[in-house]
């Protein structure tokens, strides 16, 4: 049984919600400043409320610190360092300045305890699907560009996602910024030869600092063959094939029977869809994502590799560069939230999302069967092991009629894209 304490009640309540569902742990208390919210949280989760670690009589194995760090004018990183020096494993909620990160990792290594950064967005199913699909396409196509819309409050998770997508955020070259008295400011950077355009909502409502968001984030990665988009942290993830006009003198009249492969594709594919209500995202999705970070701290915590630490430090440094380019957020007042019921909107037909979610599972099974059938057919006609063939040699070996050669080329491309064969 691991004893865990949570620091902070604002975002800490999501940690408490995650912890209450986990096995093999005991929540020994909530440590906070003693606000009305803190007392209410402690009562709701039926745990003690402390204002100092010295008040805690039980052993503490792990501390979840959900308090603003120095980057946001808080004491979260200092609290984490104090706990690490006491030999307590620590999970510190993002964002964290790279200098504070370096100090925490160094103390953790000296004390032989675990230190990690909490970042629930990386654990969300839609984000995981997006990252995996970017890697799939990147095996055969080069990233041409990345476009990002975001609220600066979640800029750290966005940078972390880009770090997973690109594997490195160096070298970071600032191409230019457009800032002014407008809600969204833009910044363009280049990482290697990949341009990334950020459009950031960089305002803070002085009466509602945490709640004034026009959006969280949206990320689009462009390739020669299309664009992959994560529309929201909770989905959907959509692939839009690139528009490419056929090289024909007569286009509409000949597409019915002589369309190129790209013209036979849908104009969009839903790769992940989850039409959950917002309350279920807060109630279930976020706590489940946080639990995955906590498990790394609780279940056999191992010392992170130097390569992993360097990547986290580099991501944090890239975050600092992004925010430096955008500048300080503009303080605004008088803004308000207005709920607009979605049923008032014009909905002319069943959405593509609804149709696709019903068919997606069956399509995946069917596609897999087709791939295996193609592969089996090739194996039946080619007996030699570890021997390379050109596509023309394969076609000749199979004995395909000329009219069906384009289909076999398509087969070979699909099999290669899905790692059944390799170039």
Predicted regions located by residue number:
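N-terminal Rossmann-like dinucleotide-binding module
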Residues: 1-45
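Beta-loop-alpha module in the N-terminal Rossmann-like domain of NAD(P)-dependent dehydrogenases
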Residues: 15, 45-107
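Hydrophobic beta-strand scaffold residues
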Residues: 27, 49, 90, 114-115
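C-terminal helix-rich "cap/oligomerization" subdomain common to oxidoreductases
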Residues: 42, 62-67, 283-340
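A contiguous active-site-proximal alpha/beta segment in oxidoreductase catalytic domains
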Residues: 97-163
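Rossmann-like dinucleotide-binding domain that binds NAD(P)(H)
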Residues: 143-236, 245-246
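C-terminal glycine/acidic-rich active-site capping loop/insertion
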Residues: 228-307, 332
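N-terminal accessory segments
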Residues: 338-423
């Amino acid at each position: 049984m691991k004893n865990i304490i949570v620091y902070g009640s604002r975002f800490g309540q999501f940690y408490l919600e995650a912890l209450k569902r986990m096995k093999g742990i005991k929540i020994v208390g909530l440590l906070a400043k003693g606000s009305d919210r803190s007392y209410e949280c402690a009562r709701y989760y039926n745990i003690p409320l402390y204002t100092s670690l010295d008040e805690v009589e039980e052993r503490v194995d792990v501390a979840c610190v959900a308090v603003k760090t120095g980057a946001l004018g808080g004491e979260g990183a200092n609290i984490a360092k104090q706990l690490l020096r006491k030999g307590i494993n620590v999970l510190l909620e993002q964002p964290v300045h790279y200098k504070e990160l370096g100090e925490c990792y160094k103390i953790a290594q000296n004390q032989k305890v675990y230190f990690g950064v909490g970042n629930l967005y990386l654990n969300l199913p839609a984000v995981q699907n997006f990252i995996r699909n970017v890697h799939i396409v990147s095996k055969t196509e080069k990233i041409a560009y990345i476009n990002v819309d975001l609220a600066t409050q979640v800029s750290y998770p966005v940078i972390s996602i880009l770090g997973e997508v690109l594997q490195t955020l160096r070298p970071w070259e600032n191409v230019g910024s457009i800032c002014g008295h407008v809600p969204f400011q833009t910044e363009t950077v280049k990482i290697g030869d990949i341009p990334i355009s950020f459009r950031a909502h960089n305002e803070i409502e002085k009466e509602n600092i945490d709640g004034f968001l026009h959006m969280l984030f949206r990320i689009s990665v462009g390739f020669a063959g299309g664009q992959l988009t994560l529309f929201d942290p909770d989905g959907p993830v959509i692939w839009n094939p690139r528009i490419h006009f056929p090289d024909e003198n007569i286009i509409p009249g000949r597409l019915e029977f002589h369309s190129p492969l790209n013209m036979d594709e849908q104009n969009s594919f839903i790769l992940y869809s989850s039409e959950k209500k917002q309350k279920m995202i807060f109630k279930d999705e976020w706590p489940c994502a946080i639990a995955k970070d906590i498990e790394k701290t609780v279940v056999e915590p191992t010392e992170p590799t130097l390569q992993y630490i360097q990547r986290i430090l580099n991501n944090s440094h890239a975050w600092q560069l992004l925010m430096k380019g955008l500048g300080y957020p503009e303080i605004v007042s008088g803004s308000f939230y207005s709920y607009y019921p979605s049923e008032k909107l014009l909905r002319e037909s069943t959405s593509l999302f609804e149709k696709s979610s019903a068919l997606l599972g069956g399509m995946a099974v069917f596609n897999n069967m087709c791939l295996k059938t193609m592969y089996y057919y090739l194996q039946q006609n080619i007996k030699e092991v570890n021997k390379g063939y050109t596509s023309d040699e394969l076609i000749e070996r199979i004995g395909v009629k000329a009219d069906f050669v384009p289909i076999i080329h398509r087969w070979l491309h699909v099999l290669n894209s899905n790692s059944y064969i390799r170039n």
